[in-house]
């Protein structure tokens, strides 16, 4: 294998592939990137056995072939080469990398040792605008669990029905539901539980590439996302999470006893200030009384904080407590100037939303001691 390519273009693609390289696998070849040069095109692959990434470059190929290079070292070498065309040539057990007067020889692996976990098949694909996809995940994905002991909760339930994209995530302490209208309508309903990590990589790359579409294919056990770019296309493939996603509709109350509308900026600023004293798992307390919300935090051996906000509230006073981080993340997801808070009782979940109904954030309360 031997090919020549632009250094900057190769650096960019290696940066994309790095997100799929395994850093803690017992299989050394997974710390590498597979290079396949064939008929004027270079394909690059990386996988950690759950997430796989493919990228390509159009570049002169002198000799077809394939080799697996150590991802981090190869990337560092290419990044630090002179700003000239890079020549990569594979031998039996090493790959030569050169540009200008600089030359390197790196140990490599045979391509046959690299596991191909995805064919990046786009059968039955459909397109979703990058901007609505990013906006939907940014709101819903924040509620997904990062705890691998319950794999189903590390996924996002993604549904596309008609012209609506819906994403749902929960870590059992909070629940986020976001619906977004699409420019195109799908004839059949598509639903899958996709790891939040994979969706995060898709949105990160989509944000970097700018406006356009994401082509999506949902197979029996994997999802593939393709992002087209003049500099070379990128595919991200992820396994789907098996199992039954929690029946989130049962968790959403039909009615609430209290509804309060608060200026989002004021609520965020107050919550952030007061929560500075909500340490060591201490709750952020919200005490509602006639036309007033008082936010409090108390941590033994640290101190306490309190701040009041004028609100339109009437009825029996009550106090409810929340994890401060979860509360702030919910309010932060609201785009409108006003935030709507709904409650039933101090021991029932609270609901955060904007004036519209396309985003819902349910948060479990913390039982308060007197």
Regions found by a protein language model. Give the residues of each.
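Structural preference for solvent-exposed beta-strand-turn elements
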Residues: 1-370
